[in-house]
Amino acid sequence: MIKNSPFIAFIIYCLPILCIAQPKYEYWDADKKQVKSEDNYKRGIAHGKTASYFKDGKIARLGWYKYGKQDSTWKFFYENGNPKAIEHYDFGVKKGHNLYYYNSGKAAQETVFKNDRPDSIWTSYFESGMPRSIESFNYGKRQGVWKYYYENGKPQSDGLFENDKKNGQLVNYYPNGNVQSQENYCNNAPCGKWAEFYDNGKVKIEKEYKDSIEYLINLWNEENKQVIVNGNGNLTLVSDKGKLRGKGTYQNGLRNGVWMFYYEDGALEYTTTYINGKINGPYNAYFQDGTLKSSGKYIESKKDSLWGFYRSNGGIEMQGTFKNNLREGQWTYYFESGKKESEGYFADDKQNGTWKYWYKTGELWKQGVFANDIKNGLWTTFWENGKKLQEGNYVNNKEEGGWQAWWQNNQLKDKGSFKDGIMIGPWQGFYSNSKPNYSGEYKNGKKNGKWQYWFEKTGKPREITNYVVGFKHGEFIQYTENGFVDNKGKYRKGKQTSTWQYYYETGGMQRQQHFKNGHLSGKSILWQLNQKMQCQMNYTVIKDNRKGHEQSVPNGTWIFYDKNGSETNRVSYKRGVRVQ
């Protein structure tokens, strides 16, 4: 909060007049004992010193703004007083050497920025002081040798970047210093020969990348038994917990034949067939209890032909055809009950042609036409009894032209027009007994002009409202069902204005009030059912600075009367406060 100060208050209130003033704001804690932060402004924009403080008064942040942008040196601190970071800015742009520290005060990282982009050598450290990483940048892009270390000082990995892409050899190490893997990259893509090793230094895998395809050449298990020789052999995949996760055959460095994969508990997860490293042929996946989960066929590692997907209870969930991994042709989706949920056609994985949707009970819900995933053409929605609910055309996923809606008894409910998804022109509504409900016009999706509403049973007027582009504006009147006026008045841009009158159901006056911009203002009168005066009131409108809006409050003399209309009491107010 801002501490109460005559000097500060003077600056704040004079700011609109003294445009060249440069006020200083101090924000204090709840007890007003300690400054939490301070900021300087020029012409309403942060300019000059800025600072924040811990509860004990020690500084947490110290910096400078220049016309709303960070500038010069910024310093950040831990609660113990040790530095946390030192950063440099030039009119909002980070630059130069920047330093970061651990809570202990030891260096954590040194960075360099050039025009707000990483540049030159970045170095980070463990809290012990040992190097953690050495990274090289050139104007925001990784460039040159990158090295990472374990806290014991031994290397973790090192590699080369060229123009932000991995190029050349990347080596990873175990904490004991032995090589974990040797990788080669060409423009960020794996290429050439790769090797993996066990932590005892013995070779685990030798493989090679050709045209982005991985070829497994040799593989040794933990007992140092070679199971893949020159790209051929049977391989068993085991989890870190020693559980069987998969098994199959390699030929000429690529997976071939039937492969089987398992859940951690040993249950079969899925089976598939490989030809020269690509999935070709039948594919079947299972839930852990052995229930079929999905079934289909692959060609060149892409889903193809008819596929079925099933629920854990054995019921079908969806079924359709793939072509080159994309949905093609007719697809059908099902509820858990097994009844159809929706059905239609895909072309290149996009909905096309007529689609139908059903209620869970089995009755048709809606149907319409898609063109490349976009609604186009006639769409019809139905009640569960089969009668039409609504109908109209879409163009590019938006309602267009005349639309109609019906009640379940087939009586017209609504009718009107759309343009580009927006309601336009005359609209009419009807009750299920075919009597009129409403009538009016839309302009660019907003009510405009005179709108009329009627009661359902009697057909008598219920309300007459005038609109200007969505706002109630002009004469307004509401009626009771027996034909008497209930209330009437005027609106201006959606807010009550001028004199409003309210009536008893018998037709007698109940109250008369005056409004200004939606708020009670001026004289209001209340009448009793016998039409004797009950109360005379006066209001004025004030601005509530705390809430940032206007409100009506009692003002002037209020006069009260008994059931016979004789005065019983008077009370005076001044801007919401009762005056003795």
Regions found by a protein language model. Name each.
Residues 1-24:
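Bacterial Sec-dependent N-terminal signal peptides
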Residues 19-580:
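Glycine/tyrosine- and acidic-biased, solvent-exposed loop/turn segments at the edges of beta-strands
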